[in-house]
Amino acid sequence: ITFLLISNLCFSQLKSVIINSETKEKIPYVNIWVENENIGTTSNEKGEFTLEINSTKTILFSAIGFETKKISSDLINNILELKPIVTELDEIVISKKLSQKLIIGKFKKSKINNYFGCGIKPWITARFFKYTEEYERTPFLEKIRILTKSDVKNSKFNIRLYGVNEKGEPENYIYNENIIGIAKKGKKITEIDVSKLDIEFPEKGFFIAIEWLIIENNKYEYKYTMEGSRKKLEGISYEPAIGTVPAETDENSWTFNQGKWKKIWKNNGGSFKRYKDKYSLLAIELTLTN
């Protein structure tokens, strides 16, 4: 009992509401990480978050349309402000004719049996789409189709669209607002219509990133047993899982956790045969149009 009391005293809980420094509006779905540690969470729809830490830490806050903020935990008060990014958008002349379409990244739902999933810590995984001259006639993004598998109804995930830096990493948003996908229960193809957002395929290519949201609506509790044991353990996941396709190299697949971008890992021998010793790439299909 003494040990438990001492342990509890060592932990402190950060609790705050994240707002826009200019408009004072609350910011939902902010990705929050303890720098260089596997501790993190997501702000809810009201911009609220709680986070338990055992000492003074450096906390990273990342949200679409805002500058990433790095701050010491002992400086976080009841209200935390993020500064919006000012983006100068080029004038876009949009044609009324939407006669041409091109689909890239096609996948077969029936062949996918490997997924990225999320436990109790938030993370982001991204897929790079390279630009080719073929896309010149259909430069606008119309639809995003993603293979999802959810154990709860209407789980939400966030889509971030990034450019690419000199190191090949995701950097700088090409669209400065959240794009929320909603996955129905079961194995489904989730389609997001972005035709009204006027997103043009950058000539340097771009990343589509999936961000898991640590919110109550996505929480799934289950029981499982370890190999060689009959004892039932309790587990928590945050839905949905996102389907992947196998790739020969890691060049187009990145992950973001602990506040840093890293290349995807190689699948081990325990993976399905089709994925064994390959790299997992998000199963994403894009419809391009003029």
Please state what every model-predicted region is.
Residues 14-21, 47, 80:
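A short, amphipathic beta-strand motif
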Residues 34, 60-71:
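A short, solvent-exposed loop/turn motif at the edges and junctions
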Residues 88-164, 211-290:
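Beta-sheet-rich sandwich/jelly-roll-like modules and their strand-loop junctions
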Residues 14, 22-36:
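Short, ordered, surface-exposed loop/turn motifs in non-cytosolic proteins
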Residues 75-96, 192:
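Extracellular beta-sheet/turn segments enriched in Thr/Pro/Gly and aliphatic residues
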Residues 38-48:
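Short, acidic Ser/Thr/Gly-rich low-complexity loop/linker segments typical of extracellular
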Residues 1-17, 290:
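Bacterial Sec-dependent N-terminal signal peptides
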Residues 156-230:
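Aromatic- and Gly/Pro-enriched, solvent-exposed loop/edge beta-strand patches characteristic
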